[in-house]
Amino acid sequence: MPKIITVGEVLVEIMGKSKNQTFRETGEFTGPFPSGAPAIFIDQAAKMGGETGMISVIGNDDFGQINKLRLEKDGVDTSQILISKDKTTAIAFVVYKDSGDRDFIFTIKDSALIELDYSKINKDYFKNCEYFHIMGCSIFNDNMIEIFSNLIPFLKSKGIKISFDPNFRKEFMENPKIKTLIMNILENADIFLPGEQELLDLTGLTSEEDAIKDLQSKGVEIIVVKRGSRGATLYNNGQRNDIEAV
């Protein structure tokens, strides 16, 4: 049984070849690439030597298989990745601008993942789990809200630490149910991995120093503030460690 587990989307990414390409005109694309934020996280954790597993649903198609095979090759347990008979694996089409911004078209809201609900999650799978990782972008429908809302008290009762990367779009916070869940996750998180603006947005404070103190006073043990090309900052045990980008 894995020690690090995540739940969420497994998808393929298909990328525009040219900068400033749009979806309104015919253009060349490359892919498919295995993707999905929680899948990328758990894959990297496995490559670093972690005992990892993922819970998800993919379609009975090659888009699902390219992901499943990649995860298995890198050491992720995929026994809890279910295969849908009726829905296809999610797809993200992506084009890039000169500014570095991206435009997306997602098919996730009608993909195989919508078949996952709390009743399908095998609680015995968490027998040896020490860390559970949540990506905010995975909270996209009522099923995922139900899953995380029920998992949080279950995880805490088992002494499993919760790692939270908010990684969400601002419009998510306009949905009262999603906002409530995100704040609930943050209140129960042991490890928090925000970007600089996410840190301030979610704490409601205006300085990083105040936000860090606030979170630490509420029991968040480890905070990693991501700064893109400028690296990251680790806050732990009252100490600050600035880390350069690789």
Question: Predicted segment positions?
Answer:
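Conserved N-terminal subdomain of the carbohydrate kinase-like
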Residues: 51-134
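Structural detector of well-ordered beta-strand residues that form the stable sheet scaffold
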Residues: 5, 53, 162-163, 224
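Conserved beta-alpha-beta core of the PfkB/ribokinase-like small-molecule kinase fold
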Residues: 131, 137-214, 230-232
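Conserved phosphate-binding/catalytic region of the ribokinase-like
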Residues: 1-5, 154, 208-246
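Glycine-centered short loops/turns at secondary-structure junctions
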Residues: 49, 75, 157-159, 219
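Alpha-helix/helix-capping structural signal
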Residues: 9-10, 197, 238
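Glycine-rich phosphate/adenosyl-contacting loop at the front of the ribokinase-like
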Residues: 1-76
